[in-house]
């Protein structure tokens, strides 16, 4: 069993642009070695928006050196980027964007969702890239809900979606640069599940909704992060009520992390170079782009 290193909770939300009230459950600023290859996770909502004809969200902004993973639970988003990719991301869908050598993108509530209003709930996860891949070509993967395997958990305890990696012979559709698992789970009240996590991997359990007991020891509630030691295998989760969770595990990238704003590289010199490349147009450009705050 993996040892629990700590439980962190983020009760306070802040706004990203005018469309995303988020709670930052972890960042590389203070947990880098314990969460690698993951860098950051923001949990937005659930938040009710009234109908509007205005665009809500975040206008064009750059990224370099990592990937962003957006998981939508409720609501609908519209994405566009400088590679020409784009589209709608609805409930159950996942957007896996590789910034790598540089990308410019924007994220807004979709016109349909803005027009009707409703509840928005989503997660954005940042995934680091090893130094050898930080200058790879930018890319974009749309992972539709119907293409993500759903596995029934033992004892009718709930379900697990394999977004990345593998679970009991079911492989997720996301293409990753390093070995990792990203599992999206729903547990029924009273269910207990044993999750296989390899020794040597960093692992974190993200509790989005509900209350759970971990390894029979400690309880964690909504909007909280449970960190585990690299040693040991398996994590036991008991749902004290219906719960929504993410299990993140991966082989650590034991390299220097230097981040500033939308860039995550390995040195200050690379950060300075990234700003210069962005300002001189080396990230490409978007048609009909709109200014906005960075996320």
What are these regions (language model features)?
Residues 1-295:
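Jelly-roll (double-stranded beta-helix
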């Amino acid at each position: 069993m993996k040892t629990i290193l700590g439980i962190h909770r983020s009760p306070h939300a802040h706004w990203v642009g005018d469309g995303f009230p988020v709670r930052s459950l972890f960042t590389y600023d203070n947990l880098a070695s314990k969460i690698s290859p993951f860098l950051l996770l923001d949990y937005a909502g659930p938040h009710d928006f009234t109908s509007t004809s205005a665009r809500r969200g975040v206008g064009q902004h750059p990224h370099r050196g990592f990937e962003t993973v957006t998981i939508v639970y409720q609501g609908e988003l519209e994405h566009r980027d400088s590679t020409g990719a784009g589209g709608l991301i609805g409930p159950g869908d996942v957007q896996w964007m590789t910034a790598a050598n540089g990308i410019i993108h924007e994220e807004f509530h979709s016109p349909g969702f803005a027009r009707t209003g409703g509840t928005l709930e989503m997660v954005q996860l940042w995934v680091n890239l090893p130094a050898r891949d930080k200058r790879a070509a930018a890319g974009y993967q749309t992972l539709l809900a119907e293409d993500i395997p759903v596995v029934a958990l033992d004892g009718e305890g709930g379900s697990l979606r394999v977004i990345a990696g593998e679970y009991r012979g079911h492989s997720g559709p996301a293409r990753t640069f390093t070995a990792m698992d990203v599992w999206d789970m729903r547990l029924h009240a009273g269910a207990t599940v044993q999750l296989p996590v390899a020794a040597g991997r960093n692992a974190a359990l993200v509790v989005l909704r509900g209350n759970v007991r971990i390894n029979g020891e400690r309880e964690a509630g909504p909007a909280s992060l449970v960190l585990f030691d690299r040693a040991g295998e398996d994590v036991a989760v008991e749902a004290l009520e219906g719960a929504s969770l993410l299990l993140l595990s991966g082989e650590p990238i034991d390299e220097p992390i230097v981040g500033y704003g939308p860039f995550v590289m390995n040195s200050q010199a690379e950060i300075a170079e990234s700003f210069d490349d962005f300002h001189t147009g080396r990230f490409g450009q978007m048609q009909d782009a709109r200014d906005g705050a960075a996320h």
